Amino acid sequence: MEQVVTELHAQGFETFLCGMARGCDTLFAESVLAVQRRCPELRLVAMIPCPSQPDAWPEADRARYSRLLAACSEIRVLEPSYSDGCMLRRNRAMADAAALLVTVYDGGPGGTAATIRYARQKGKQILPLWY
């Protein structure tokens, strides 16, 4: 993913939004921070659905999340507490704010599929890393 971030930076992208979920979001955030060491103008913006997002995660994942949050240029908390649909609303807020969506998607149903559909409806550019 570092190569993707490097290529996007070469195209003029400097601000990267991240939902901070486990898995690909975490890898993407780490990639932005790695490239930021060479290109300090890069900004990582955490888009968190609610403060309790990591509460049920294993301790190692919570620690990794905390380290990543501490390194973010900005943290946007979208809702004060968990509620049904807050993850979807976070995803839509990211799609609304983004010029380009970098996606990792296996073709199955769920939040990623819904966000890709939403972004397409909004005319957003999508860069799929895996379909």
Locations of the language-model features?
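Acidic/glycine-enriched connector segments
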Residues: 1-131
